[in-house]
Swiss-Prot record:
Proteolytically cleaved to yield a secreted protein. Disulfide bonds: none annotated. The keyword Glycoprotein applies. Residues 206-219 have a biased composition (Low complexity). One of its GO terms (biological process) is imaginal disc-derived wing vein specification. Keywords: Glycoprotein, Golgi apparatus, Kinase, Membrane, Notch signaling pathway, Secreted, Serine/threonine-protein kinase, Signal-anchor, Transferase, Transmembrane, Transmembrane helix, Wnt signaling pathway. This is Extracellular serine/threonine protein kinase four-jointed. Residues 187-199 have a biased composition (Basic and acidic residues). It catalyses: L-seryl-[protein] + ATP = O-phospho-L-seryl-[protein] + ADP + H(+); L-threonyl-[protein] + ATP = O-phospho-L-threonyl-[protein] + ADP + H(+). One of its GO terms (molecular function) is protein serine/threonine kinase activity. It comes from Drosophila melanogaster (Fruit fly). The gene is fj.
Amino acid sequence: MYDIKRLEAGQQKLQQAQQPLGLDLSGQQQQLTCSVITAPEHRANPNPSSISQSNPSEATHMTLLTLRRRRSLQRRACLLSILAAFVFGMALGVVVPMFGLPRHQDSPPDLPEEQIQMVAVEPLSSYRVEFIKETDELSAEQVFRNAFHLEQDKDAPDSMVVKKLDTNDGSIKEFHVQRTASGRYRKGPERRLSKKMPERVQPQETSRSPTTSPTNPTSEHQAGFIEEDVYWGPTVEQALPKGFAAKDQVSWERFVGEQGRVVRLEQGCGRMQNRMVVFADGTRACARYRQNTDQIQGEIFSYYLGQLLNISNLAPSAATVVDTSTPNWAAALGDITQAQWKERRPVVLTRWLSDLEPAGIPQPFQPLERHLNKHDVWNLTRHMQSERQAQSQPHGLLKRLGAASSPGSAHQSNAIEETGTGTETANGALVQRLIELAQWSDLIVFDYLIANLDRVVNNLYNFQWNADIMAAPAHNLARQSASQLLVFLDNESGLLHGYRLLKKYEAYHSLLLDNLCVFRRPTIDALRRLRAAGAGRRLRDLFERTTSAGVRDVLPSLPDKSVKILVERIDRVLGQVQKCQGS
């Protein structure tokens, strides 16, 4: 019995001695890095007594200390490498450029002319533009004089690229401009797109210096064309087409308001809901109908402004109201419904003109020659006189046949009688050219005052995409075939809608006015009287006097904001006349 108990006690001690060994072995299996040191010793001596004598817990503790030291050394080495890389980068990126590398020259070396020409054709980048200081801001006249191409910058709505002709050396330059909130411009650096042509300067100056001796027949002949260097002379004024007089306007207003009975509406007269109105007596008119009354106001008040300035190139117009309950509109009820016109809406009725043909832009207003002054008139006079002298000399049969078959200038006056002597024909051709230019001077002044977007400015704006558009007929401009009268059509964008878009299109308006230095004296005199009497008051009085109470109920008068802008633009035109007189 005693032996059995001693045997069981010995077995329990042996089991207790093996339990720590099992824990150490399991721990060694979980930590693979420690098993590399202790595992071979355990596998080589499987005897339990020898395992207990080797003290495995002490070996495990030493292994963990070695692993911690190794990790600590790795962290320190990593931090030291990061610090060394940072110091090296600082030295390479900052210290070396400041002290170690040579500086570039302040001014680049002179390049050959061929290389300069190659550099000049590189496209401009908006981020390379450096505008001048605010104190050196320029006016539209200073920026756009002699400019022949404007291109809106897509990335910057207030900026545009300007190409202009340098009159000093005949070269073409390009630069950026930026419009400021004050309406002035900041100009970027210029770059030359073409070579200087100094050989052109002397002939140009010579041609612009005609002799003023009273014995010179050329000067005597020019005296009737230009007066005081800025006005068209009596020869041109007396030859101008009569146009539409004040009595035509009075009779048309009476006809529309009292006598006219609309019988039907027909398609025509432009876009959208405009219609051709046919009256009972066969009279026709173009009806301008818009959902927005601003364009109706612009059309009728632009016409009133033309009347106050004695510009006879505007067809008679009158404002009325669509009301099928009245005898004037009752017969056209079906056509009005089909046209989707609404009752009690204002319309502008303009007398229909049947003998109209397209009118082009004269050469003096096309790029690169967009200017008209006394020198241009003198040069044109001398040129046509030299042609007349050449034609007066006897020619052979083949030369006469060739001259007879040569085509005339596109979009120019063709109403010259082919009877009479060659001298009379040449004089008639010269006067016809000057008549067209005189009417264009009124057109430029009128469109600038009302800020019309739908005529020449339309061509100028689209010139950046279509270079041939300036040679095409002008938008909303026509010519009467018989009288050669230019008719200014479609002025609905004037005075209101055009004023809202001045920030975008003012450069194009100023471009035309700044290059005009020959005006009609009656127009400028009327403009001075209008400025003194008050443009807003005169326009509103004319509106009250010529429209019915029904029209005034649905069509507002001219806003004060438009009147203020109009007065500013009147001063701008008068300032341009004064500047031309001093030049």
